[in-house]
Amino acid sequence: KAPQTAYEFEKNDSHGNEMVLRFDGSVTISEAQVYLGGKEKRHFVCSVPNAEGDGWDAIGEETELLSVYCWNPVEIHYRTYELGIVSMDESAEVLEIVLLDPDGNPILPSNADDYPEAFDEQELFPADTTYEYQSMFDEVYHARTANEIVEGRTIYETTHPPLGKWWMSLGIRVFGMTPFGWRCVCALFGILMVPVSYAFMRKISRSTWIASFAALLIVFDFMHFTLSRIGTIDVIVGFFILLTFYLMYLVLDDLKMGCSWKTVCLMILNGMAAGAAMASKWTGVYACAGIAVLLFTFLFQEYGTAAARTRKGMSGQAAISYLAGLSVICIAAYILIPAVIYVASYLSYGNDMGNGNVFQTMWENQQLMLHYHEKTVFEHPYASEWYEWAWIKRPLLDAYTSLKSGKISVVSTFGNPVIWWSAIPALFYTIYLWQIRQDKIAGYLCISYASMLFPWLFIHRTVFIYQYFACSMIQILMLGNCLHFFWERDPKRT
């Protein structure tokens, strides 16, 4: 749980931008814990009555509270019978203020009823302010924006398309603006990745035990576990990317027997998944490029040469007619449908970024995103390069809390070394199967993997290991395929 009612500091409000708290006698206040609402970087000054009793003296310097939907500490260390809290900004949203004595016990002001929204949920202050009770890492952007979609507020995080945050907003609508509320949808998408990976591997290998093995690898992968338990959009786009490649595999497998109504339905579903991936995060565009290469490669191999057409008993003119009809379906499924989904995702922003014109809103946001990702270059202790991800050179620290028991609570994003390091030789073996053994499944996985990794070679913004998430899912499929090839398909073992 987390505080829900908000007290607004407003300079034109009846209370103004200040709060005067009174106590029954003098009390020693060690610190104040402030659960900040949806506006970051709020500035406060605490003060106490001066010795003459005719004014106020500030306690220390102005304090900046950085993190939204998070408990922010304010050091006080003063004995007083009154405490003034002044907001230095035009407005500030505070969901709860908890004053603590030197032993960590809460102190409730005698006039708390004057500011009911700030002191009505004292019981929600946890003994240890870990990630279970507050936002962490990019949740301060994505969860906040999901809540802004729910409440129709001005959208803050506009550096990614809206759909991922819209999905997160569904959890907030049901469970409120709490850690569970903004994380539950991500957990659901993480869970759904397991049956999709099972079905994908089952289709590739036609083996139940190998499909189960691949699904278990995803279950026990640390990055999948972490991203499924935090409120960011990465597991959502990861799910749609995995689904996009799976559905394209089904499409190509079906096209071997010609284009049927079943094939058309699969193409439409494939286009919907691709559109959802793009509308969640731009990394979905890489997957769209990947399935385009896979589709064109398949069509060239099947119809691009006279020998291929002869094998199918098809003349050149018949092949042209067939491909022309297929092209119309592909344009509808892989261009129009994704475009509609992408543009429609901006309806969740309402009129906030435009003048009621969803196309204008979408276009302006594309320019903003492009500018942001071009300019986002900064030093970060957990940043890493694309060639460092596979061997987990630098994990990402999401949250760190020192507990009162002397222990620490840490959330970190990185892969399971057993799985990821095993996937490195599996990658090279898959390339061998593709190039030397002419294995088409291996080729499909290699092209899928390359489409998700190669764009990062040309991106010079600051990046982190979680950008490798989609690649790691494909590498797990490579592990399963290598195992299948080694044990069940290699004629040398029969």
Where do the model's predicted regions map?
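Transmembrane-helix motifs of polytopic, lipid-linked glycan transferases
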Residues: 180, 184-205, 243-247, 425, ...
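Aromatic-rich transmembrane-lumenal/periplasmic boundary elements in polytopic membrane proteins
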Residues: 101-146, 319, 329, 338-391
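Membrane-interface alpha helices of multi-pass inner-membrane proteins
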Residues: 263-281, 452-453
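Short acidic/glycine- and proline-prone juxtamembrane loop motifs at membrane-interface regions
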Residues: 182, 223-236, 280-283
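Loop-to-helix entry region of an early transmembrane alpha helix in multi-pass inner-membrane enzymes
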Residues: 158-168, 174-195, 227, 231, ...
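Membrane-interface transmembrane helices that cradle and orient dolichyl/undecaprenyl
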Residues: 205, 244-266, 277, 296-306, ...
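Transmembrane-helix signature of polytopic, membrane-embedded enzymes
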Residues: 177, 192, 197-220, 239, ...
